[in-house]
From Swiss-Prot:
Location(s) in or outside the cell: Periplasm
Protein name as it appears in the record: Tol-Pal system protein TolB
Record note on quaternary structure: The Tol-Pal system is composed of five core proteins: the inner membrane proteins TolA, TolQ and TolR, the periplasmic protein TolB and the outer membrane protein Pal. They form a network linking the inner and outer membranes and the peptidoglycan layer.
Record bears the keyword Acyltransferase: no
Family, as annotated: Belongs to the TolB family.
The organism of origin for this protein: Francisella tularensis subsp. holarctica (strain LVS)
This protein's UniProt keywords: Cell cycle, Cell division, Periplasm, Signal
GO cellular component, one term: periplasmic space
Signal peptide feature range: 1-20
Pfam families linked to this entry: PD40
HAMAP family listed in its UniProt record: TolB (MF_00671)
Cited function: Part of the Tol-Pal system, which plays a role in outer membrane invagination during cell division and is important for maintaining outer membrane integrity.
A biological process term (GO) from this entry: cell division
Membrane-spanning parts: none
């Protein structure tokens, strides 16, 4: 039985060690996006330069804007902006006042080409230099929302698992890490030796992470309270306890259980208050359940028809029943809804391409589109506002990386790469909101 349970974790390892082409830089597709130039009234002090540099990175790491900071000299007033030599559609002018040692007031003005007035302006007061990245992400969110009408995601977080000493018989280290969306400000929130951590998933209020782990001779599902570090075991069933995810209201989790010594797993919904279970599936190996944004359905992976594919089930059905998502999909794993419920992003193994890529299924028109082109791309997780997808890629040397791609497939960039084959990065989960 231990071999069966261990197989759940080995599956993640194998997927992560398939070959893939690592994408490590921003590449822009054919759709021309509005260009934003970030300029400053201070190009001498380190703090303004750092803030503007992070802002430019943020405004390039999305599906709707592109940015640069080509002006390397001070601009005090909007009248000094050299519009004729710029190709920019917008300029973000940042003005810094050094109030005291390590403390600034920052004024941000958004200007539009051929417009003599300020499009938008905002002031941030008493900002300590230690908050440099937080300030930059906050300004980027403001600019992004004003120029696109959509909320920015630059203050969101990513949770993921890092495995070290991968090939050691004993002493394998598992760390659950939370970082900023761009990989900075990493914090290890849980560390275990020789006890795997898998498939972390956030609660909608951002207070908890639910995950599965093999500990004390058995597999279980646990919650981690992020603020306190408190860990609570919430399942103790025989056999496989895996792939948990929270319902939108945080009152339930969906998970996969074998409930004994069978190698088959079924999807259940657990009420967290009463621990009561409702069974959603009845046959095959069913795993990786995710709730729809409205909480009325669950999407999951099943091999019931001979190969893994995506199925959808209603959470309100009296008896277990589910249907295949689309006959257009050959093999698929790890589905995730976009926040608007109009798309499902998943790991795709097409009959026309080798390896696995991240793909987007449009629930409105039924189209399937690969948005990555690697050979071992897996574990997609969607940003809280739906523009971007984080995922795991593995290159030809077997090194894993945490990467990001826009939902339209145009922009790719790297967040973190394992620096050797003895480290594995896996199971990313995007926070549900800005912090």
């Amino acid at each position: 039985m231990r071999k069966i349970i261990a197989g759940v974790f080995i599956f993640v390892f194998l997927i992560s060690n398939l070959y893939a082409d690592l994408v490590a830089e921003v590449t822009t597709g054919v759709i021309q996006k509005p260009l934003v130039t970030v300029v400053s009234d201070n190009v001498v002090d380190q703090f303004p330069q750092q803030v503007n540099s992070v802002m430019v990175a943020d405004l390039n790491h999305n599906a709707k804007l592109q940015a640069n900071d080509t002006i390397k000299y001070e601009i005090k007033q909007k009248q000094n902006i050299p519009w004729k030599s710029l190709k920019s559609d917008y300029v973000v002018l940042t003005k810094y006042t050094n109030n005291s040692y390590n403390n600034y007031t920052v004024e941000v003005q958004i200007l539009k080409r051929n417009d003599t007035s300020y499009l938008q302006a905002i002031t941030y007061k008493n900002i300590n230099v230690s908050l440099m990245r937080t300030l930059a992400h906050k300004i980027s969110n403001y600019v992004y929302q004003k120029l696109t009408g959509n909320q920015g995601f630059f203050l969101t977080k990513l949770a993921y698992v890092k495995v070290s000493n991968l090939y050691a018989r004993y002493g394998r280290l598992y760390e659950l890490i939370i970082s900023d969306y761009d990989g900075y400000n990493k914090h290890v929130v849980l560390r275990q030796t020789d006890n795997p951590i898998a498939t972390p998933s956030w609660s909608n209020d951002g207070r908890y992470i639910v995950y599965s782990s093999y500990s004390g001779g058995s597999m279980g599902v646990y919650t981690l309270e992020i603020a306190t570090g408190k860990v609570t075991r919430i399942t103790n069933y025989k056999g496989i306890n895996s792939s948990p995810s929270f319902s939108p209201d945080g009152k339930e989790i969906a998970l996969a259980l074998s409930k004994g010594y069978s190698d088959q797993t079924n999807i259940y919904i657990m009420n967290l208050a009463t621990k009561a279970l409702k069974r959603i599936t009845i046959n095959g190996i069913n795993t990786a359940p995710k709730f729809s944004p409205n909480g009325q359905s669950i999407v999951f992976t099943s091999d019931r028809e001979g190969r893994p594919n995506i199925y959808v089930a209603s959470v309100n059905s009296k008896y277990p029943q589910s249907s295949i998502l689309s006959t257009k999909i050959h093999q698929a794993y790890e589905p995730n809804y976009t926040p608007d419920g109009k798309n499902i992003v998943f790991m795709n193994q097409s009959s026309r391409t080798s390896g696995t890529q991240i793909a987007d299924f449009n629930l409105v028109n039924g189209s399937v589109t690969n948005i990555t082109n690697g050979k071992a791309d897996s574990s997609p997780t969607v940003s809280p506002y739906g523009d971007m997808v984080a995922y795991i890629s593995t290159n030809t040397r077997g090194y894993s990386s945490l990467d990001m791609v826009s939902l339209d497939g145009d922009n790719h960039f790297n967040i973190e790469t394992a620096d050797n084959g003895n480290i594995l990065i896996q199971s990313p989960s995007w926070s549900p909101k800005n912090f």
